[in-house]
């Protein structure tokens, strides 16, 4: 995902000049706050070695491709450059549950971080997808992806308080901090979210964490059509309801197949219990059948949604497979209030998340322009998230991401020039700026 989709700035020169006045040389902290995630014997700070590798690459003119567990290798334009494996640089630097902040090295397995937080009744509220057992914290930040709760709690970038990186000159730098009220360097830290390793080596990240909600309920609304679901979600979004996540899909696993909307509520016990009958009444008025799911099954289904192991994500519809060999999974990000998109017959029925803001479809590479036009008309953009396994790079030739505007291209070039003047991280993962 292009860096420019992660920033609110509109003026390249003023923006980048202001950013780099805030640079500081990074010295790894010697202190530990609160609870350590792992025994220090299993933690490793490879800052010095990583700096040396970057400096060697700079001297040799070698481009570097940063990699953790490789769980998101499918994402982005290309995988060029000499591999710089980040898994050895791992461990939790500090964790203070009472302050709701954790600082962790990039190579730390995401499962380990989540287990530590769970032991203290806390979590990463944006529900980052793993897409594989080897997922690391660095890959989580670099991909910039958020899970089902994103529309209600915010995106990954909203939870980044500070980062420590190695830039293209081999310098270790720090931005932001470990407190939520920190201002200096805040936007620079967030630029790392979704940068796909093209701005520098992420050493550490400080993240805001949240307590696990005391109550949760998932409602299964069967027989709710796509536009009906969008209308309901828009109506509920304007009310004081603990709406946390939603997923609408044409459920082909049911016999006969039918439309279904899944809604997750999270919050105080009283709020969740009061909301369930209200949502049920609204859905029943439309002729839907409503069932409150068992918590273990609901939890497994939301995990499957996050990790894209639901039937929808496993394979394109058989009717489309019979006609096309270049079917890929497309990600359409649009305003939540966007009505059902009018898409051609070569595009599958969508799976809709984020209360209408995220729409997944299967479509052939030849439909790229149609999808991008539909998303842009709605005020959003379309991304080829997973290319056809049989065609891979061939289907990415038309571009994975929606092309940037000239202004956005200018800002991105300036950012890359400041972070990485020699272009050793310019692997083409985000396409040409």
What does each model-identified segment do?
Residues 77-79, 87, 132, 288-433:
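Conserved glycine-rich FAD pyrophosphate-binding loop
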Residues 111-113, 227-231, 270-277, 338-346, ...:
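Short, conserved charged micro-motifs
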Residues 17, 22-24, 28-102, 129, ...:
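N-terminal flexible segment immediately upstream of the FAD-binding catalytic core
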Residues 5-9, 13:
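Low-acidity, Ser/Thr- and Arg-rich intrinsically disordered low-complexity segments
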Residues 37-66, 86-133, 141, 145-178, ...:
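N-terminal glycine-rich flavin-associated loop
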Residues 142, 161-320:
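C-terminal substrate-binding/cap subdomain adjacent to the FAD-binding core in PCMH-type
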